[in-house]
Amino acid sequence: MIPCDLFGAAGEYRPSYNRDEEERLEKDLRALSSAPPKDALAKIKTLAAEHAPRSTWVWATLGEAPLALAIGHLRDMAEVVQTSGNPSTWEALAEYYSMLGWKADRSMLRALDAARSTATTKAVTAAIRAVYLPWLEKFSTLTQALATTYPATGPQTCRTLPAEEGTVYLFADGLRMDLARVLEEKLISSGLEVRFEHGWSALPTVTATAKHAWMPLAGKLGGPLEGEGFEPKEQSSGKTITHARFKQLLEELGTSFLIYDVTFFPTGCAWTEFGSIDTYGHNQGAKLAWRVEEELAGLQQRILELIHVGWTKIKVITDHGWLLLPGGLPKAELPKHLAASRWNRCAIPSAGAQHGYPMTSWFWDSAEAVVLAPGVSCFVSGMEYSHGGLTLQEALIPSLTLSTKQTGGVKSVVLKEMKWSGMRLNMVLEGAQGLPVDVRSKVADATTSFSANPITGAADGQKTSLLVADDEAIGAAAFLVVVDQNGQPIFKQPIVIGENLYATRRIRPNRC
Protein backbone atom coordinates (compact mmCIF):
# COMPACT_ATOMS: atom_id res chain seq x y z
CA MET A 1 0.00 0.00 0.00
CA ILE A 2 1.27 3.55 -0.82
CA PRO A 3 1.76 5.63 2.34
CA CYS A 4 -0.89 8.27 2.66
CA ASP A 5 1.65 11.10 2.90
CA LEU A 6 3.58 10.08 -0.22
CA PHE A 7 1.56 12.54 -2.29
CA GLY A 8 1.48 15.24 0.36
CA ALA A 9 0.54 18.86 0.00
CA ALA A 10 3.83 19.79 -1.62
CA GLY A 11 3.28 17.27 -4.38
CA GLU A 12 6.99 16.59 -4.72
CA TYR A 13 6.42 13.08 -6.05
CA ARG A 14 3.47 13.89 -8.30
CA PRO A 15 4.46 14.65 -11.89
CA SER A 16 1.08 16.25 -12.49
CA TYR A 17 1.68 18.74 -9.68
CA ASN A 18 5.05 19.70 -11.11
CA ARG A 19 3.52 20.15 -14.57
CA ASP A 20 0.77 22.35 -13.17
CA GLU A 21 3.32 24.50 -11.35
CA GLU A 22 5.44 24.85 -14.49
CA GLU A 23 2.37 25.98 -16.43
CA ARG A 24 1.48 28.47 -13.72
CA LEU A 25 5.00 29.86 -13.66
CA GLU A 26 5.05 30.11 -17.44
CA LYS A 27 1.84 32.14 -17.37
CA ASP A 28 3.17 34.43 -14.63
CA LEU A 29 6.42 35.06 -16.49
CA ARG A 30 4.71 35.82 -19.77
CA ALA A 31 2.50 38.35 -17.98
CA LEU A 32 5.64 40.37 -17.18
CA SER A 33 5.78 41.55 -20.80
CA SER A 34 3.43 44.41 -19.86
CA ALA A 35 4.75 45.07 -16.34
CA PRO A 36 6.80 48.15 -15.38
CA PRO A 37 10.42 47.26 -14.51
CA LYS A 38 9.96 47.87 -10.78
CA ASP A 39 6.91 45.61 -10.61
CA ALA A 40 8.62 42.96 -12.74
CA LEU A 41 11.63 42.91 -10.40
CA ALA A 42 9.41 42.37 -7.37
CA LYS A 43 7.36 39.69 -9.12
CA ILE A 44 10.45 37.75 -10.20
CA LYS A 45 11.69 37.62 -6.62
CA THR A 46 8.29 36.45 -5.37
CA LEU A 47 8.07 33.74 -8.03
CA ALA A 48 11.62 32.59 -7.30
CA ALA A 49 10.79 32.10 -3.64
CA GLU A 50 7.60 30.19 -4.47
CA HIS A 51 9.22 27.81 -6.93
CA ALA A 52 12.65 27.39 -5.33
CA PRO A 53 11.76 24.01 -3.73
CA ARG A 54 10.93 22.52 -7.13
CA SER A 55 14.45 23.23 -8.39
CA THR A 56 15.69 20.50 -6.03
CA TRP A 57 13.05 17.92 -6.91
CA VAL A 58 13.69 14.92 -9.10
CA TRP A 59 11.65 16.51 -11.89
CA ALA A 60 14.26 19.25 -12.25
CA THR A 61 16.99 16.61 -12.53
CA LEU A 62 14.96 14.89 -15.24
CA GLY A 63 14.53 18.12 -17.19
CA GLU A 64 10.84 18.41 -16.39
CA ALA A 65 11.09 21.67 -14.43
CA PRO A 66 13.09 24.07 -16.64
CA LEU A 67 11.28 27.16 -15.42
CA ALA A 68 11.86 26.25 -11.78
CA LEU A 69 15.57 26.41 -12.62
CA ALA A 70 15.31 29.47 -14.85
CA ILE A 71 13.48 31.57 -12.25
CA GLY A 72 16.43 31.21 -9.88
CA HIS A 73 18.75 32.70 -12.50
CA LEU A 74 16.22 35.43 -13.24
CA ARG A 75 16.17 36.28 -9.53
CA ASP A 76 19.98 36.54 -9.52
CA MET A 77 19.78 38.83 -12.54
CA ALA A 78 17.15 40.98 -10.84
CA GLU A 79 19.27 41.39 -7.72
CA VAL A 80 22.17 42.79 -9.75
CA VAL A 81 19.87 45.12 -11.66
CA GLN A 82 18.42 46.50 -8.42
CA THR A 83 21.86 47.38 -7.02
CA SER A 84 23.31 49.01 -10.13
CA GLY A 85 23.88 52.61 -9.03
CA ASN A 86 24.87 55.39 -11.46
CA PRO A 87 28.63 55.35 -12.13
CA SER A 88 29.64 58.44 -14.07
CA THR A 89 33.33 58.00 -14.98
CA TRP A 90 35.16 55.45 -17.11
CA GLU A 91 36.92 54.15 -14.02
CA ALA A 92 33.69 53.78 -12.05
CA LEU A 93 31.91 52.10 -14.96
CA ALA A 94 34.77 49.65 -15.42
CA GLU A 95 34.89 48.82 -11.72
CA TYR A 96 31.13 48.29 -11.53
CA TYR A 97 30.89 46.08 -14.59
CA SER A 98 34.04 44.02 -13.99
CA MET A 99 33.13 43.35 -10.35
CA LEU A 100 29.31 43.13 -10.34
CA GLY A 101 27.51 44.08 -13.54
CA TRP A 102 28.75 41.05 -15.49
CA LYS A 103 26.74 38.83 -13.15
CA ALA A 104 23.50 40.12 -14.66
CA ASP A 105 24.70 39.03 -18.10
CA ARG A 106 25.74 35.62 -16.80
CA SER A 107 22.43 35.02 -15.01
CA MET A 108 20.47 36.09 -18.08
CA LEU A 109 22.33 33.57 -20.25
CA ARG A 110 21.83 30.82 -17.69
CA ALA A 111 18.10 31.49 -17.56
CA LEU A 112 17.96 31.16 -21.36
CA ASP A 113 20.03 27.99 -21.22
CA ALA A 114 17.64 26.41 -18.71
CA ALA A 115 14.55 27.05 -20.84
CA ARG A 116 14.92 25.50 -24.29
CA SER A 117 11.43 24.71 -25.51
CA THR A 118 9.53 27.33 -27.50
CA ALA A 119 7.02 27.93 -24.71
CA THR A 120 9.55 28.21 -21.88
CA THR A 121 11.86 30.39 -23.97
CA LYS A 122 9.02 32.83 -24.61
CA ALA A 123 8.26 32.98 -20.89
CA VAL A 124 11.88 33.63 -19.92
CA THR A 125 12.23 36.15 -22.75
CA ALA A 126 9.30 38.16 -21.39
CA ALA A 127 10.98 38.38 -17.98
CA ILE A 128 14.36 39.29 -19.46
CA ARG A 129 12.96 42.07 -21.62
CA ALA A 130 10.99 43.48 -18.68
CA VAL A 131 14.02 43.75 -16.37
CA TYR A 132 17.29 43.26 -18.24
CA LEU A 133 16.56 45.50 -21.24
CA PRO A 134 15.94 48.65 -19.13
CA TRP A 135 19.19 47.94 -17.27
CA LEU A 136 21.09 47.59 -20.55
CA GLU A 137 19.61 50.85 -21.81
CA LYS A 138 20.45 52.69 -18.59
CA PHE A 139 24.11 51.72 -18.71
CA SER A 140 24.42 52.30 -22.43
CA THR A 141 23.22 55.87 -21.81
CA LEU A 142 25.73 56.35 -18.98
CA THR A 143 28.53 54.98 -21.16
CA GLN A 144 27.71 56.87 -24.34
CA ALA A 145 27.46 60.15 -22.41
CA LEU A 146 31.24 59.87 -21.99
CA ALA A 147 31.97 58.91 -25.62
CA THR A 148 34.07 62.00 -26.35
CA THR A 149 36.60 60.97 -23.68
CA TYR A 150 36.77 57.27 -24.56
CA PRO A 151 40.08 55.85 -23.20
CA ALA A 152 41.24 53.84 -26.25
CA THR A 153 41.62 56.36 -29.06
CA GLY A 154 44.44 54.98 -31.18
CA PRO A 155 47.56 52.80 -31.29
CA GLN A 156 49.28 55.02 -28.73
CA THR A 157 46.62 54.06 -26.15
CA CYS A 158 46.29 50.33 -26.78
CA ARG A 159 47.69 47.42 -24.80
CA THR A 160 51.14 45.95 -25.32
CA LEU A 161 51.71 42.22 -25.89
CA PRO A 162 55.48 41.73 -25.60
CA ALA A 163 57.09 38.69 -27.24
CA GLU A 164 58.21 36.84 -24.12
CA GLU A 165 59.95 33.47 -23.92
CA GLY A 166 57.58 30.64 -23.00
CA THR A 167 54.42 32.74 -23.49
CA VAL A 168 51.37 31.92 -25.60
CA TYR A 169 48.80 34.58 -26.48
CA LEU A 170 45.48 32.79 -26.87
CA PHE A 171 42.98 34.88 -28.83
CA ALA A 172 39.30 34.06 -28.18
CA ASP A 173 36.99 36.10 -30.42
CA GLY A 174 34.08 37.59 -28.44
CA LEU A 175 35.13 36.45 -24.96
CA ARG A 176 32.82 38.80 -23.06
CA MET A 177 33.41 39.80 -19.44
CA ASP A 178 30.86 37.37 -17.97
CA LEU A 179 32.27 34.42 -19.90
CA ALA A 180 35.80 35.37 -18.88
CA ARG A 181 34.78 35.47 -15.22
CA VAL A 182 33.29 31.98 -15.45
CA LEU A 183 36.45 30.80 -17.24
CA GLU A 184 38.50 32.32 -14.43
CA GLU A 185 36.60 30.18 -11.89
CA LYS A 186 37.19 27.05 -13.97
CA LEU A 187 40.91 27.67 -14.32
CA ILE A 188 41.41 28.40 -10.64
CA SER A 189 39.66 25.11 -9.84
CA SER A 190 42.10 23.42 -12.26
CA GLY A 191 45.01 24.56 -10.13
CA LEU A 192 46.23 27.54 -12.14
CA GLU A 193 47.31 30.95 -10.96
CA VAL A 194 45.06 33.51 -12.67
CA ARG A 195 45.57 37.25 -12.98
CA PHE A 196 42.40 38.93 -14.25
CA GLU A 197 42.58 42.34 -15.93
CA HIS A 198 40.40 44.49 -18.13
CA GLY A 199 40.82 47.24 -20.69
CA TRP A 200 38.92 49.05 -23.41
CA SER A 201 38.41 47.73 -26.92
CA ALA A 202 39.13 49.70 -30.06
CA LEU A 203 36.15 51.49 -31.65
CA PRO A 204 34.07 50.40 -33.37
CA THR A 205 33.92 47.13 -31.44
CA VAL A 206 34.20 44.79 -34.41
CA THR A 207 36.88 42.19 -35.07
CA ALA A 208 38.15 43.98 -38.17
CA THR A 209 39.14 46.98 -36.08
CA ALA A 210 39.86 45.52 -32.65
CA LYS A 211 41.75 42.25 -33.19
CA HIS A 212 44.99 43.96 -34.23
CA ALA A 213 44.81 46.74 -31.63
CA TRP A 214 47.93 45.86 -29.65
CA MET A 215 51.53 46.97 -29.65
CA PRO A 216 53.95 46.50 -31.26
CA LEU A 217 51.73 45.28 -34.14
CA ALA A 218 49.55 48.40 -34.02
CA GLY A 219 52.58 50.54 -34.79
CA LYS A 220 52.69 49.02 -38.27
CA LEU A 221 49.02 49.68 -39.10
CA GLY A 222 46.74 52.62 -39.85
CA GLY A 223 44.06 54.10 -42.10
CA PRO A 224 42.37 55.54 -43.99
CA LEU A 225 38.97 53.87 -44.25
CA GLU A 226 38.21 52.49 -47.69
CA GLY A 227 35.29 50.47 -48.94
CA GLU A 228 32.69 49.06 -46.57
CA GLY A 229 34.91 47.51 -43.90
CA PHE A 230 36.79 48.68 -40.83
CA GLU A 231 40.06 46.84 -41.51
CA PRO A 232 43.32 48.71 -40.93
CA LYS A 233 46.06 48.74 -43.54
CA GLU A 234 49.74 48.04 -43.33
CA GLN A 235 51.42 51.43 -43.46
CA SER A 236 54.38 50.22 -45.49
CA SER A 237 52.26 48.83 -48.33
CA GLY A 238 48.82 50.39 -47.96
CA LYS A 239 47.29 46.92 -48.16
CA THR A 240 44.56 45.55 -45.90
CA ILE A 241 45.80 42.96 -43.39
CA THR A 242 44.79 39.48 -44.50
CA HIS A 243 45.01 36.48 -42.17
CA ALA A 244 48.06 35.21 -44.06
CA ARG A 245 49.80 38.58 -43.74
CA PHE A 246 48.86 38.74 -40.04
CA LYS A 247 50.71 35.46 -39.48
CA GLN A 248 53.74 36.82 -41.33
CA LEU A 249 53.73 39.96 -39.19
CA LEU A 250 53.61 37.84 -36.05
CA GLU A 251 56.73 36.00 -37.21
CA GLU A 252 58.46 39.31 -37.90
CA LEU A 253 57.66 40.35 -34.33
CA GLY A 254 59.19 37.15 -32.95
CA THR A 255 55.93 35.29 -32.33
CA SER A 256 55.03 31.94 -33.91
CA PHE A 257 51.48 31.08 -34.97
CA LEU A 258 50.11 27.83 -33.52
CA ILE A 259 47.23 26.38 -35.49
CA TYR A 260 44.24 24.95 -33.64
CA ASP A 261 44.85 21.77 -31.65
CA VAL A 262 48.65 22.01 -31.94
CA THR A 263 50.76 22.66 -28.86
CA PHE A 264 54.25 22.20 -30.39
CA PHE A 265 57.45 22.44 -28.44
CA PRO A 266 57.30 25.20 -25.80
CA THR A 267 60.02 27.50 -27.04
CA GLY A 268 59.94 31.17 -27.93
CA CYS A 269 56.66 33.08 -28.01
CA ALA A 270 53.45 32.01 -29.78
CA TRP A 271 49.98 33.16 -30.82
CA THR A 272 47.05 30.78 -31.11
CA GLU A 273 43.29 31.13 -31.55
CA PHE A 274 40.38 29.17 -30.15
CA GLY A 275 36.62 29.18 -29.99
CA SER A 276 33.47 30.01 -31.93
CA ILE A 277 31.60 32.27 -29.51
CA ASP A 278 31.23 35.14 -31.96
CA THR A 279 30.39 32.82 -34.85
CA TYR A 280 27.65 31.07 -32.88
CA GLY A 281 26.27 34.42 -31.75
CA HIS A 282 25.95 35.78 -35.27
CA ASN A 283 24.52 32.53 -36.63
CA GLN A 284 22.22 31.48 -33.79
CA GLY A 285 21.31 34.63 -31.88
CA ALA A 286 19.97 33.99 -28.39
CA LYS A 287 20.65 30.26 -28.77
CA LEU A 288 24.28 31.15 -28.11
CA ALA A 289 23.26 30.70 -24.46
CA TRP A 290 23.02 26.95 -25.14
CA ARG A 291 26.62 26.87 -26.39
CA VAL A 292 28.42 28.89 -23.74
CA GLU A 293 29.33 26.07 -21.37
CA GLU A 294 30.76 23.82 -24.07
CA GLU A 295 32.76 26.72 -25.50
CA LEU A 296 34.23 27.52 -22.09
CA ALA A 297 34.99 23.85 -21.43
CA GLY A 298 36.86 23.67 -24.74
CA LEU A 299 38.78 26.84 -23.97
CA GLN A 300 39.72 25.50 -20.54
CA GLN A 301 40.97 22.26 -22.09
CA ARG A 302 43.04 24.10 -24.69
CA ILE A 303 44.68 26.20 -21.97
CA LEU A 304 45.49 23.15 -19.85
CA GLU A 305 47.00 21.37 -22.86
CA LEU A 306 49.31 24.32 -23.48
CA ILE A 307 50.33 24.42 -19.83
CA HIS A 308 50.87 20.66 -19.68
CA VAL A 309 53.31 20.63 -22.60
CA GLY A 310 55.45 23.24 -20.88
CA TRP A 311 54.36 26.74 -21.92
CA THR A 312 55.02 28.76 -18.78
CA LYS A 313 52.48 31.53 -19.32
CA ILE A 314 49.22 31.73 -21.25
CA LYS A 315 47.56 35.10 -21.78
CA VAL A 316 43.95 34.88 -22.94
CA ILE A 317 42.89 37.97 -24.87
CA THR A 318 39.91 39.05 -26.92
CA ASP A 319 38.81 41.81 -29.27
CA HIS A 320 35.30 42.79 -28.20
CA GLY A 321 32.23 41.72 -26.30
CA TRP A 322 28.63 41.76 -27.49
CA LEU A 323 24.98 42.41 -26.72
CA LEU A 324 22.47 39.58 -26.60
CA LEU A 325 18.74 40.06 -26.12
CA PRO A 326 16.13 37.36 -26.86
CA GLY A 327 13.36 38.72 -29.03
CA GLY A 328 15.70 41.17 -30.72
CA LEU A 329 17.51 44.40 -29.93
CA PRO A 330 15.61 47.66 -30.59
CA LYS A 331 15.80 49.12 -34.10
CA ALA A 332 17.33 52.52 -34.90
CA GLU A 333 16.59 54.00 -38.31
CA LEU A 334 19.55 54.95 -40.46
CA PRO A 335 18.55 55.33 -44.11
CA LYS A 336 21.08 53.92 -46.53
CA HIS A 337 21.68 57.29 -48.18
CA LEU A 338 23.08 58.59 -44.87
CA ALA A 339 25.74 55.89 -44.61
CA ALA A 340 28.58 54.88 -46.90
CA SER A 341 28.64 51.56 -45.04
CA ARG A 342 26.10 50.35 -42.48
CA TRP A 343 26.80 47.54 -40.01
CA ASN A 344 24.53 46.29 -37.23
CA ARG A 345 25.78 48.64 -34.50
CA CYS A 346 28.01 51.09 -36.35
CA ALA A 347 28.30 52.81 -39.69
CA ILE A 348 30.53 54.95 -41.87
CA PRO A 349 28.58 58.18 -42.50
CA SER A 350 28.06 59.66 -45.92
CA ALA A 351 29.64 63.07 -46.45
CA GLY A 352 27.51 65.74 -44.79
CA ALA A 353 24.98 63.24 -43.42
CA GLN A 354 22.67 64.52 -40.66
CA HIS A 355 21.44 61.65 -38.50
CA GLY A 356 21.62 62.76 -34.86
CA TYR A 357 23.36 59.63 -33.59
CA PRO A 358 26.50 59.41 -31.42
CA MET A 359 29.79 59.79 -33.28
CA THR A 360 33.32 58.69 -32.56
CA SER A 361 36.64 58.51 -34.39
CA TRP A 362 37.92 55.32 -35.96
CA PHE A 363 40.64 53.77 -33.82
CA TRP A 364 43.12 53.53 -36.70
CA ASP A 365 42.65 57.06 -38.07
CA SER A 366 41.19 59.85 -35.95
CA ALA A 367 40.24 61.77 -39.09
CA GLU A 368 37.71 59.08 -39.96
CA ALA A 369 34.26 59.38 -38.35
CA VAL A 370 32.16 56.44 -37.21
CA VAL A 371 28.45 56.49 -36.36
CA LEU A 372 27.43 54.47 -33.29
CA ALA A 373 23.95 53.04 -32.86
CA PRO A 374 22.28 54.78 -29.89
CA GLY A 375 21.71 52.84 -26.68
CA VAL A 376 21.50 49.13 -27.40
CA SER A 377 19.75 49.53 -30.74
CA CYS A 378 20.75 48.15 -34.14
CA PHE A 379 20.56 49.68 -37.58
CA VAL A 380 19.24 46.29 -38.75
CA SER A 381 16.01 44.84 -37.36
CA GLY A 382 15.58 41.48 -35.66
CA MET A 383 19.13 41.12 -34.32
CA GLU A 384 19.34 39.17 -31.05
CA TYR A 385 23.14 39.23 -31.02
CA SER A 386 25.31 42.10 -32.14
CA HIS A 387 28.35 44.26 -31.44
CA GLY A 388 30.14 47.25 -32.90
CA GLY A 389 28.74 49.93 -30.62
CA LEU A 390 29.70 51.47 -27.30
CA THR A 391 28.34 49.67 -24.24
CA LEU A 392 30.08 48.02 -21.31
CA GLN A 393 29.18 44.61 -22.70
CA GLU A 394 30.89 45.38 -26.02
CA ALA A 395 33.76 47.65 -25.07
CA LEU A 396 35.16 46.61 -21.66
CA ILE A 397 37.23 43.55 -22.53
CA PRO A 398 38.91 41.06 -20.18
CA SER A 399 42.30 39.37 -20.24
CA LEU A 400 43.52 36.45 -18.15
CA THR A 401 47.18 35.67 -17.50
CA LEU A 402 47.66 32.04 -16.47
CA SER A 403 50.54 30.12 -14.99
CA THR A 404 51.07 27.08 -12.80
CA LYS A 405 51.08 27.53 -9.05
CA GLN A 406 54.47 27.48 -7.39
CA THR A 407 53.25 24.57 -5.29
CA GLY A 408 52.82 22.47 -8.42
CA GLY A 409 49.03 22.31 -8.79
CA VAL A 410 49.38 21.22 -12.43
CA LYS A 411 51.98 18.70 -13.57
CA SER A 412 53.82 19.79 -16.71
CA VAL A 413 55.08 17.30 -19.28
CA VAL A 414 57.57 18.55 -21.86
CA LEU A 415 58.53 16.71 -25.05
CA LYS A 416 62.26 17.24 -25.67
CA GLU A 417 62.97 14.80 -28.52
CA MET A 418 60.97 12.49 -30.75
CA LYS A 419 62.00 10.13 -33.57
CA TRP A 420 60.42 7.22 -35.40
CA SER A 421 62.48 4.12 -36.05
CA GLY A 422 60.22 1.98 -38.18
CA MET A 423 57.09 1.45 -36.07
CA ARG A 424 58.85 2.31 -32.82
CA LEU A 425 58.55 5.81 -31.42
CA ASN A 426 61.54 6.92 -29.36
CA MET A 427 61.15 10.06 -27.30
CA VAL A 428 62.61 12.01 -24.41
CA LEU A 429 60.04 13.45 -22.02
CA GLU A 430 60.37 15.59 -18.93
CA GLY A 431 57.83 15.31 -16.14
CA ALA A 432 56.43 11.96 -17.30
CA GLN A 433 58.38 9.52 -15.14
CA GLY A 434 56.11 6.66 -14.06
CA LEU A 435 53.10 8.01 -15.97
CA PRO A 436 51.34 5.99 -18.70
CA VAL A 437 52.43 6.96 -22.23
CA ASP A 438 50.33 5.98 -25.23
CA VAL A 439 49.64 6.60 -28.92
CA ARG A 440 45.92 6.99 -29.63
CA SER A 441 43.60 8.15 -32.35
CA LYS A 442 41.43 9.88 -29.72
CA VAL A 443 43.19 11.61 -26.86
CA ALA A 444 40.80 10.68 -24.05
CA ASP A 445 39.80 7.22 -25.31
CA ALA A 446 42.16 4.43 -24.22
CA THR A 447 40.36 1.95 -26.47
CA THR A 448 41.81 3.74 -29.53
CA SER A 449 45.40 2.90 -28.54
CA PHE A 450 47.91 1.78 -31.18
CA SER A 451 50.48 0.65 -28.59
CA ALA A 452 51.64 -2.97 -28.57
CA ASN A 453 52.11 -2.92 -24.79
CA PRO A 454 51.45 -0.48 -21.96
CA ILE A 455 54.49 1.65 -21.14
CA THR A 456 55.36 4.36 -18.64
CA GLY A 457 57.59 7.37 -19.00
CA ALA A 458 61.29 7.11 -18.19
CA ALA A 459 63.19 9.48 -15.93
CA ASP A 460 63.87 13.00 -17.18
CA GLY A 461 66.52 12.94 -19.90
CA GLN A 462 66.11 9.20 -20.49
CA LYS A 463 64.60 7.60 -23.58
CA THR A 464 61.04 6.28 -23.56
CA SER A 465 60.27 3.80 -26.34
CA LEU A 466 56.83 2.78 -27.60
CA LEU A 467 56.04 0.17 -30.27
CA VAL A 468 53.00 0.45 -32.53
CA ALA A 469 51.59 -3.04 -33.06
CA ASP A 470 49.76 -2.74 -36.38
CA ASP A 471 51.90 -2.18 -39.49
CA GLU A 472 48.79 -1.03 -41.34
CA ALA A 473 48.62 1.99 -39.05
CA ILE A 474 51.63 3.59 -40.72
CA GLY A 475 50.75 7.06 -41.95
CA ALA A 476 47.71 7.35 -39.67
CA ALA A 477 47.12 10.59 -37.79
CA ALA A 478 47.29 10.06 -34.04
CA PHE A 479 48.31 11.63 -30.75
CA LEU A 480 51.17 10.95 -28.39
CA VAL A 481 49.41 11.05 -25.02
CA VAL A 482 50.58 11.10 -21.40
CA VAL A 483 47.92 10.49 -18.76
CA ASP A 484 47.95 10.97 -15.01
CA GLN A 485 47.37 8.25 -12.41
CA ASN A 486 43.62 8.78 -12.76
CA GLY A 487 43.72 8.16 -16.50
CA GLN A 488 43.16 11.82 -17.42
CA PRO A 489 45.22 13.16 -20.36
CA ILE A 490 47.71 15.80 -19.25
CA PHE A 491 49.74 16.01 -22.46
CA LYS A 492 49.08 15.44 -26.15
CA GLN A 493 51.09 15.96 -29.31
CA PRO A 494 49.72 15.33 -32.83
CA ILE A 495 51.85 12.80 -34.72
CA VAL A 496 51.80 10.70 -37.89
CA ILE A 497 52.58 7.07 -37.16
CA GLY A 498 55.90 5.96 -38.65
CA GLU A 499 56.61 9.31 -40.25
CA ASN A 500 60.16 10.57 -40.11
CA LEU A 501 59.16 14.19 -40.56
CA TYR A 502 59.62 14.32 -36.82
CA ALA A 503 63.31 13.32 -37.04
CA THR A 504 64.98 14.20 -33.80
CA ARG A 505 63.43 17.49 -32.67
CA ARG A 506 65.77 19.21 -30.24
CA ILE A 507 64.90 22.48 -28.62
CA ARG A 508 66.88 25.34 -30.10
CA PRO A 509 66.85 28.80 -28.58
CA ASN A 510 64.31 31.03 -30.28
CA ARG A 511 64.41 34.09 -28.10
CA CYS A 512 61.66 36.63 -28.53
Where are these regions (language model features)?
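…; additionally, a secondary subgroup of soluble metalloenzymes is captured
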Residues: 1-167, 174-512
